[in-house]
Amino acid sequence: MIEKYLLGTYTRRISKGVYQLELDTENQKLQNLTFVGSAIDPTYVAESNQKRIYAITKVKDDKGDVTGGFVEWDGTSDDFPLKPIASVHDQETSPAYIAVDEDKRLVFTANYHAGTVNTYRIADDGSISKADRIMDKGTLGFRKEQQDGPHPHYINLTPEGRVVAVDLGVDKVFIYDLEANGKLVPVSELQMQDGYGPRHIYFDAKKKVAYLVGELSSNVAVLDYDADKGVLSLRDIHSTIPDDWTEHNGAAAIRVSKDGRFVYVSNRGNNSIAVFSSDESGNLSLIQRISTEGDFPRDFNLSDDQSFVIALNQNSDNATLYTRDPESGKLTMIQKDFTVPEGVSILRKK
């Protein structure tokens, strides 16, 4: 079987925008890197059920001033590179994350450098209009990466349809109610310890927990989640790196197996994927730490049948493929030399 994945990238050295790769599950290999569309630093990509592709980007005017937003492409087409259906550039710089609400026809962005979360309405013809914009607030963390303001790093839906926003700068996780018109209504805030540096979060509705990656602290936290009230609370915290690791590291992406039994976190610096088992209550235990066979693994993803994991190494421009044991959750590297320029994110194409 051939599975296709969309790849977000930086375009600071050799990348030109968004790419696509194929996973050949029968022959157990990555293949056919294809250029999808041109954009400046399209680090994260989202796709709707209508197969519209939304990619973060930014533009520069004649004076060199930058505005950020995203571009929309028709993902049903294979006429690469794709031509934009629509685009919007109304933010101070390019966002850090993008997600889609299928039911309400909305797009969400988290803008790390501007300190804002934004919602947009998407019309039937693909046209885009702003629905809401909120500036994160809170006490800045003590680490140098937190000293210049709030830094929203992630926004998406919770399992019950609220919105969660994760802020690295103020060490907070925000929960919002979402109105039909795209307006965000504050519900609750979780204050993490100073310097935790929240980056990404994953909810397990069955276990009533969420797993929160701390980029700056190289941790993953288990949070209890009351979906009726929209309230998170801290249970415990686990390190993603070895105890004797003294060099720089930033925890990055988190993925959870479909059966909820295993949690995976990438480490940029230690250049590894940490593998945790998760019991019936969501408690974590470290069971493996495996090299990504490259430098700075920002993201990775599991295949449809959960038998493979694909990791992207940004600085070394390569993707690494692993087989995954569904019983133990452990990974085995089988390919490490597949070229992906400045890879940042990987999304299964619909």
Predicted regions located by residue number:
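A short beta-strand motif characteristic of beta-propeller blades
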Residues: Q31-G37, K83-V88, D132, T139-E145, ...
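Loop-centered beta-sheet repeat module
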Residues: R162-S218
